[in-house]
């Protein structure tokens, strides 16, 4: 198999490095910055390390490979696909690993499909420097199974989750709401606790509340409790915001929490559930699909 990368930055380099160690010999790349200092020197060094062969144009790259991985940025995903269109054929598998919205992946799929090439939306769910080519990947689209099959001999960790372009990226986007939100909560919380020298005590208190409870159960408890008590919690957050303002600590996450809780209170779920906590997460989500009439 001959594999090509459009874009040979950190992600492309990491994948190529791992694939070389796994025995893949025919790797090619084209990067629009390969002639532009200081990027050119880094790209050249990475190519030498991975044994990747440089292609001067996208046309040359696609003439040499069967599988091409678009490895640029989400903002460039569509334009790169459009640039590749004149040179894609039915013999190509086009894989987009860029971090982009499901709508962008759907657009890229539509562009690629018109050429007869097969498309796979691939969402990388871990750190490339840590995992290299074994980074967990979710794949969707018409070419997802083909992508999994052709990379299996090299140990890539690809899980096919559906045939619809955008599904894989949707999972990554929705997961990021939680993961980046959690980091933001740590930043805001610990910035404030540090002012009072109570870092360990606050973290210890949070740990007591969360440790020992399975994550899915934590999600159920928080959601079922939260929708019934959202209005009270929103008012409590007003005091939190006032405290942070007094300290001169940015309160962006606390304000967002208050607004989210107020929006949740607007569903009227406390009344709908008679003040009692619903027993399942599914009950909560169904009740929140549409506001009460």
PLM feature spans:
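Short, basic/aromatic-enriched C-terminal tail that caps enzymatic domains
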Residues: 274-293
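Conserved beta-strand segments of alpha/beta enzyme cores
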Residues: 26, 53, 93, 118, ...
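Rossmann-fold dinucleotide-binding core
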Residues: 100, 104-180
């Amino acid at each position: 198999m001959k594999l090509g990368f459009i874009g040979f930055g950190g992600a492309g380099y990491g994948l190529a490095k791992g694939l070389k160690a796994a025995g893949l010999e025919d790797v090619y790349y084209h990067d629009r910055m390969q002639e532009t200092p200081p990027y050119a020197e880094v790209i050249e060094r990475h190519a030498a390390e991975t044994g990747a062969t440089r292609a001067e144009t996208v046309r040359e790259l696609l003439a040499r490979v069967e599988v091409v991985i678009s490895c640029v940025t989400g903002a460039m995903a569509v334009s790169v696909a459009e640039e590749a269109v004149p040179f894609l054929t039915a013999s190509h598998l086009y894989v987009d690993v860029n971090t982009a919205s499901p709508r962008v992946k759907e657009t890229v799929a539509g562009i690629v499909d018109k050429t007869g090439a097969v498309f796979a939306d691939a969402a990388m769910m871990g750190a490339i420097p840590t995992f290299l080519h074994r980074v967990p990947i979710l794949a969707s689209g018409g070419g997802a199974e083909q992508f999994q099959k052709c990379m299996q001999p090299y140990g890539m960790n690809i899980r096919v989750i559906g045939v619809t372009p955008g599904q894989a990226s949707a999972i990554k986007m929705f997961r990021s709401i939680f993961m980046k939100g959690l980091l933001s909560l740590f930043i805001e919380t610990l910035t404030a606790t540090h002012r009072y020298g109570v870092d360990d005590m606050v973290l210890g208190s949070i740990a007591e509340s969360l440790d020992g409870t399975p994550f899915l159960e934590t999600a159920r408890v928080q959601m079922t409790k939260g929708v019934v008590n959202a209005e009270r919690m929103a008012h409590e957050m007003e005091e939190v915001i006032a405290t942070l303002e007094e300290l001169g600590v940015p309160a962006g996450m606390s304000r967002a929490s208050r607004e989210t809780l107020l929006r949740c209170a607007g569903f009227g779920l406390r009344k709908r559930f008679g003040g009692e906590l619903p027993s399942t997460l599914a009950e909560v989500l169904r009740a929140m699909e549409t506001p009460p009439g």
